[in-house]
Amino acid sequence: MTKFPEGRQASAVIPLLWRAQEQEGWLTRPAIEAVADLLGMAYIRVLEVATFYFMFQLQPVGQIAHFQICGTTTCMICGAEDLVSVCKEKISSKPHVISEDGKFSWEEVECLGACANAPMVQIGKDYYEYLTAEKFADLIDQLAAGEVPTPGSQTGRYAAEPATGLTSLQDHEAGKAAFNASVQLAVDLGDTVKRIDGSEVPLLTPWLGKGAKSKAAPKAKVKAAAKTKTAKAKAAK
């Protein structure tokens, strides 16, 4: 919040929601309300943000991973439907339904901006690119076994460079990292799947009291809460 000018703290709503979601894998009603209170925003305003972006989940997801499969043009042409079929076979026949063992869930989303390495799947903050049905099925099996597959291209391709390597602009080749920037950071931190199930370094989560149970918040109730809060504020004046 200190990154934003005085009076503009509400600009931190997206990163705060993202950090809140990392605690339980999805945004519970108490989490949304805690972010709203922290920023001095009406509950409904924070809920509006949470419902606008598909990176935010408003219902429970798999304990290990929630797969977001890009379903727009480039990925579909390159085989995204095969990835969806893998999810239906190994996780559940419908999106947003948690697997029987509680480990996984999935959904199809709009373009994730990795068209050069299509098809791809996002898990939390990480991209797994250049997938085939076989590679994706193996990736799920690795996660189920407690392993953490390296994000990025699953064929060894560096970022979006030619699969056979550069034929020009080779001056920067010497000494470059093994992976492109975002993948290298995730690998260096060892921070990939951990940030989905909330097992990374604990943050302050005032809405997670001892023995507290997470409950989904019907939109109507959140709206009512916002109205009640506004009415109380007016009465106080």
Spell out what each predicted region is.
Residues 1-237:
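Signature of N-terminal electron-transfer/Fe-S-associated modules in redox systems
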